[in-house]
């Protein structure tokens, strides 16, 4: 028994040593930036990796992959957007390079469209690397919003911060409805199951998304693949789940993130955008162009409360609105939604702010946002 215990300890140390030798001081993560990847999804994925003190992150293009950039990475992430368009942008030779990269012992994470790209879905351009296939693809535009999921036993090991919760909540945006592939013999493990029935748009049928895999994970050659049909990177308090997925693909130990980073209590209910909500959301675009300061602030309040998907693309310029009250509210929106992609904009806004009280308030919001990042 003692000999067996010593052997296990030695093998664990050897594995950790090999991991350390392979990546140096930091794990190198590449986020694919190509046609088909939504810009905000790319920004948010980068920001999520920045939460992990043991990781560095960069974007890579299809040309970078062809030029050998994968040799300088430990893991690749295919972000949200449009999976088939990313397939077209990558090209078949680059996708084979990615497959070989994973087979060699590296990691890959697919988020929403990226997870779709990884599937084996008939009639859809995909890579056949995660053992799942998407169904009901004719209703992909089924809707979006904060959605519930429950962890499986394996998922609780990977995300122990959520293990005692019956349900947790993250952003879902028309992700694939997954079942096991019947043509690719590649078993996967469901790490979480979706609990929300999303059918707000596109005449999508009811009872299609609920009780389906939310996160799946599988071996691929010597490497690993993790697929998320949802957007933790776009969910305040849950962004840390993305670097944790990367850790799983690389067989890295689970490490704790700060309480500022891990905050699942920000959302404790479903918030699905109805057709009426979407119409109201679209109207606020014009409010930010032509509305009064009071109207702009009311719009920001509503958009933040319903976790608007589109608002994050509109709020950046409000940091430099003519109204000090709007500038302060925009800073609070960015800080309270953990929107690290606009950190440099908030820093610039604080530097040029002339109103003393507004500047003090904006500086507090800036410090709140910066507290997400690990200490250097």
Positions of the model-derived regions?
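Aromatic-Pro/Gly-enriched surface loop or interdomain linker
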Residues: 20-72
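Extracellular ligand-binding/catalytic regions of CAZymes and related secreted enzymes
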Residues: 23-27, 99, 126, 212, ...
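A glycine-rich, often tryptophan-bearing local segment used as a flexible ligand/cofactor-contacting loop or short
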Residues: 84-163
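Catalytic beta-strand/loop cores that center a nucleophilic Ser/Cys/Thr
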Residues: 147-221, 229-236
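Amphipathic alpha-helical scaffolding segments comprising HEAT/armadillo-like alpha-solenoid repeats
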Residues: 277-286, 308-320, 339-350, 373-376
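Short inter-helical turns and helix N-cap capping residues of alpha-solenoid HEAT/ARM repeat scaffolds
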Residues: 291-292, 322-323, 354-355
């Amino acid at each position: 028994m003692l000999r067996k215990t010593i052997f296990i300890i030695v093998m664990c140390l050897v594995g950790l040593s090999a991991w350390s030798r392979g990546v140096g001081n930091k794990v190198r993560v590449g986020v694919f930036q190509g046609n088909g990847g939504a810009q905000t999804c790319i920004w948010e994925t980068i920001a999520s990796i920045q939460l992990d003190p043991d990781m560095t992150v960069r974007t890579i293009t299809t040309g970078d992959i062809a030029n050998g950039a994968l040799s300088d990475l430990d893991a690749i992430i295919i972000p949200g957007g449009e999976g088939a368009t990313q397939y077209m942008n990558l090209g078949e030779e680059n996708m084979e390079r990615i497959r070989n990269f994973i087979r060699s012992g590296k990691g890959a994470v697919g988020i929403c469209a990226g997870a779709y790209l990884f599937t084996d879905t008939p009639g859809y351009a995909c890579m056949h690397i995660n053992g799942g296939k998407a169904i009901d693809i004719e209703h992909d535009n089924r809707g979006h919003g904060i959605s519930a999921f429950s962890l499986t036993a394996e998922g609780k090991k990977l995300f122990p911060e959520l293990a005692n919760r019956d349900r947790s909540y993250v952003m879902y945006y028309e992700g694939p409805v997954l079942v096991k592939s019947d043509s690719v013999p590649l078993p996967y493990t469901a790490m979480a199951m979706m609990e929300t029935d999303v059918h707000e748009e596109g005449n999508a049928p009811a009872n299609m998304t609920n009780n389906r895999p939310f996160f799946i994970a599988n071996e691929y050659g010597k490497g690993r693949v993790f697929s998320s049909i949802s957007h933790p990177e776009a969910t305040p308090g849950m962004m840390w789940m993305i670097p944790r997925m990367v850790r799983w693909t690389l067989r890295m130990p689970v490490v704790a993130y700060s309480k500022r980073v891990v905050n699942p209590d920000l959302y404790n209910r479903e918030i699905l955008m109805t057709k009426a909500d979407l119409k109201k959301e679209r109207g606020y675009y014009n409010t930010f162009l032509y509305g009064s300061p009071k109207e702009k602030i009311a719009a920001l309040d509503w958009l933040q409360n319903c976790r608007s998907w589109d608002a994050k693309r509109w709020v950046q310029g409000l940091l430099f609105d003519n109204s000090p009250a709007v500038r302060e509210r925009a800073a609070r929106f960015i800080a309270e939604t953990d929107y690290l992609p606009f950190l440099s904009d908030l820093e610039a806004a604080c530097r040029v702010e002339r109103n003393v009280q507004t500047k003090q308030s904006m500086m507090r919001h800036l410090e709140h946002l910066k507290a997400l990042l690990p200490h250097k």
